[in-house]
């Protein structure tokens, strides 16, 4: 079990390493835009560790979404688990701000924590199945004043990203859809549902980095 004491310990441990880096700042226009979909809150601690690492690097990345996602089975809303890690980040934020500029404030992070699809796999994608997470993805990519591409990093399942693509595909012209997908980049840690395969097969023009297998786990055929 990941307790808040352990989370704080991890924050301070990684913070100690971060302090050894240069104070050189990254200009806003040079930062990568990022939305993360994550199944944080499950039995494995890996996404908690990844979230801590990400937040400690958030002065050099524009984090624009933290979305609670499904994997291959229906799972309850775990946005509260993401919020717990963000609140613990707030405990070390004053110290981080002494060493580097550019960290997002707590309210900024709180506002971008969203729930993704409530139903797993492609069953959760289609007409009338929009979620706060899929709507956030669309609104972030649509920002007209920011032409930097948006990276979508999937630490869990891909069906919230799939829902965003499904909606734009079915509600806009082909030209507008092409413009939309030209602004996204996807990194899929591992196909943890069938939605990633659906995206890759239906939209091959999307820049999509896919891990199709990892040691000790071979996804089923429909996932790859």
Can you describe what each PLM-predicted range is?
Residues 1-26:
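Bacterial Sec-dependent N-terminal signal peptides
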Residues 25-224:
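N-terminal acidic, glycine/proline-rich low-complexity segments
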